[in-house]
Amino acid sequence: MERHYILASHGMFSQGIYDSIRIILGEKKHVHLITAYVKDGQDISDLIKETMKKIPTDAEIIACTDLFGGSVNNELMKYIGKKHFHLLTGMNLPMLMNLFLFSDEDADKLIRRLFTEAKTGIMYC
């Protein structure tokens, strides 16, 4: 099954973090970026619907958002009942690096790995 990734955020965060991924890991396939509230009059619901239309209906989707409870995350929560749709929040660079480095893993196993390793990526130096 083909896997697609949605990186969605308030402002340009998703674009910036994906730029970092490209520098470190190279270009990745099937990545869709949603940068909400960048242009006046943008409707987050419409942006998400447009993105979902670009993804094959039988594809697996892993969506990552910047903030739990934020409008971007809340709009994507409407898709939680969709088959093979996974929604993660608290998007950060180590999380996304692991998402792409271990992209061949089963989604459930991969998501468990992401959360386990994300906890060790936050440190006080």
Predicted regions located by residue number:
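N-terminal loops that bind phosphate or other acidic moieties
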Residues: E2-C64, F68-C125
